[in-house]
């Protein structure tokens, strides 16, 4: 479909896509990450994780200095060379983590919804839930514009909770393992479009875009990509796009980083 020589941006989800859902291993994707880095193709990480978590992962993956999308699009970490852009080093969309937490605490106290947020527990508990080390688990609590939670109520109550959040200008989003509350104005798609427009403004040409994801919260991102890889995932709802033209969308047979590699193999060889 395209070559590594043309202007190209790769947007990638993390857990269940570039990273294995259980072990967080990414080695099957390492050859492609090296090839893209050598070809000066930016790989822009896009996740529900905090910017602190993602900056650590960026360095681990050899992607430091590039922009990234954190907290499902509520936070954009700017590229190191974008220091002249207003808001550097991060752009926050919507209300803050603290304000969202206040709303959730009020709903829990007054309307008796049952859930546990990451703010309710310590890093040892999060490490147990996620399989992360204590130091990495501590980074998951550094939210700036969203709240991560475990839902502990019925599906009927979830529908009521979602409606109440919508009334208050918030959205309730499902990730690979947890649920996330963020401002209704934020999203991976809006954040990706902003980054694409910034690259276009700086280079004078709109880059071709390829997105990879495995969960329902990746659908908005994949909808705005020129090409999309839907990595086989664990979520029972999966990913469904409005336009699933097979020349544009590839569903992998493999999961996690093996699927990530499969998707890159497909689009770079299908010329």
UniProtKB/Swiss-Prot annotation:
Note one Pfam family from the annotation: Hydrolase_3
- GO MF annotation terms: magnesium ion binding; mannosyl-3-phosphoglycerate phosphatase activity
Cofactors (names): Mg(2+)
Please list the residues that bind Mg(2+): 13, 15, 214
User: What Enzyme Commission number(s) appear in the record?
Assistant: 3.1.3.70
Gene3D superfamilies recorded for this chain? HAD superfamily/HAD-like, Putative mannosyl-3-phosphoglycerate phosphatase, domain 2
Q: Where does this one sit in the cell?
A: Cytoplasm
Q: Which UniProt keywords apply?
A: Cytoplasm, Hydrolase, Magnesium, Metal-binding
Task: Name the active site residues.
Answer: 13 (nucleophile)
The entry's cellular-component GO terms read: cytosol
InterPro entries tied to this protein: HAD-like_sf, HAD-SF-IIB-MPGP, HAD-SF_hydro_IIB, HAD_sf, MPG_Pase
- Indicate the family of this protein: Belongs to the HAD-like hydrolase superfamily. MPGP family.
Name listed for the protein in its UniProt record: Mannosyl-3-phosphoglycerate phosphatase
The organism of origin for this protein? Escherichia coli (strain SMS-3-5 / SECEC)
